[in-house]
Amino acid sequence: MLKLSIIIPVYNSSKILDKLVNEINLNLNETFKNDYEIILVNDFSKDDSWGTIKKISEKFDFIKGIDLAYNVGQHGAIFVGLKNSKGDRIIIMDDDLQHPPQSLISIYEQLDLFDACYTLYLKRKHVFWKIFVSTVNNFFSSFIFDKPFKIYTSSMKGIRGDVKDRFVGQNPKIPFIDSLILKEAKNITNIKVYHQERFEGKSNYDVKKLFILWFDMIENYHFYPLRFGSLIGFISFCVVKLFRIFYAKKSFSFEIKEKTF
């Protein structure tokens, strides 16, 4: 077993990946040597992200590339990465360099004391609507998933390998990573990190995708643990079904097109 696995969902980021991998390696190589892996999960990108991943994997032994057969979304791509990870500790981060590689060791060290560690961003570089939606999402997830109000869930986070092992075999219809972590992690902490400017391009998440994710969360986890009550749960379920008629997508599956390992 390796000391650390880093899971990165990739979508249309071919121009960023070289710099991202180099910065991660620069921050980890002295501490971990060859005892870590970076798993890059290509979520059916429209650019040459997969070609870039294959080139990087030929250069570095610690790179593992996974090419998905079709787009499953950020949480689905992360779930595939988790299923293929071998680290005793696992850190999940984005592909846009807004998550600072300099904070990876700090997150890793927190996992000696906690089951999960979420990052709390200082001076967030996201646009206002994304910050607002994220804040609302964190508020409601406290009710839905019994999350402590003082814990802020974010996309850069770390978990212990045994936490992953407890949920990775569940194969949910549509995985919502934070709900799975919150269910299995007994003690959780936050650490503050600096939020960097996006290195290239613009965010691949828009308002529609964020709302689809939120509705997926309600549709697939509204039973958890019946905190809305039967009436609110029924209304939410009906609204979600109507929304899905207009923004339907495939159920999540584990169809991998190609691997580099």
Task: Describe these PLM feature segments.
Residues M1-V127, F243-F246, S251-T260:
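Structured catalytic core of nucleotide-sugar glycosyltransferases
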Residues D61, F114, N171, A185-K186:
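Structural motif
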Residues K15, F176-F261:
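Hydrophobic helical membrane-anchoring modules
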Residues N12, I16, K33, G169-K173, ...:
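Alpha-helical structural elements of signaling/regulatory helical domains
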Residues I66-Y70, Q74-N84, P101-P175, Q196-F215, ...:
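Acceptor/aglycone-binding surface of glycosyltransferases and processive sugar-polymer synthases
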